[in-house]
């Protein structure tokens, strides 16, 4: 079981190196992350985009392109679709967003002919390695699903479990996070949490243990759980935090990023291959960590 990103990177040494297709690769921060990933055997890469601009950026950041496959496609929409094709056809194992707007990128991901649709819910999973914490924290969904309904939450849990399994956590503990740790029929998130816990009890959601509802404190702190009399195998020990909506999840994501000493990475799952969808504000390290996470998920998918 990996407890931090150093241990996650060590896990990659045990699997064949995976290949990432970068859509519209003429993006300096993305190419810097790709350089780091390839130099440390985290992943190999196929760069799809404007070849001249890619070479100009590579020269600026001292990136030797001699070992890279480059597909010269100047139009961003065509380049993005070609990168998706590389993944759906098996020539690459994962997809990464470069210098292309998110809407165009996702349209290609969802393309009916060559896209990465599976019929499952797509969701974002962030993984945090917080200094002083004894385990990784998996957070969903801070980027993709806005106001998930109950059926969406089932899909979000299943997707987060896939990532947790890839990180070596065989039976992750899942906590649906709510304002309070008791069922209140005026708070739909608490009702959903109780239903999810019952589905877990009956084996309807597999590969994990779900309990709830939980307030954040008694989901992650055994001391807080004990103080409030909250018991069970998940209380104070949660690995996966299912937030009720994107507002709560995004605030928590940014709180952990800016108010704690932590490392993180994230990816889009529910697709036929992992998708790395970082933002312009994400750090260099976050981009590299996201590539590593995607490589682990891709290795488990094979």
Curated annotation (Swiss-Prot):
It catalyses: butanoyl-CoA + phosphate = butanoyl phosphate + CoA. Signal peptide: none annotated. It comes from the Bacteria. GO terms for biological process: butyrate metabolic process. Keywords: Acyltransferase, Transferase. The keyword Nucleotide-binding does not apply. Pathway: Lipid metabolism; butanoate metabolism. InterPro entries: P_Ac_Bu_trans, Phos_Acetyltrans/Butyryltrans, Phosphate_butyryltransferase, PTA_PTB. GO terms for molecular function: phosphate butyryltransferase activity. Belongs to the phosphate acetyltransferase and butyryltransferase family. This is Phosphate butyryltransferase. It comes from Clostridium beijerinckii (strain ATCC 51743 / NCIMB 8052) (Clostridium acetobutylicum). The lineage of its organism: Bacteria, Bacillati, Bacillota, Clostridia, Eubacteriales.
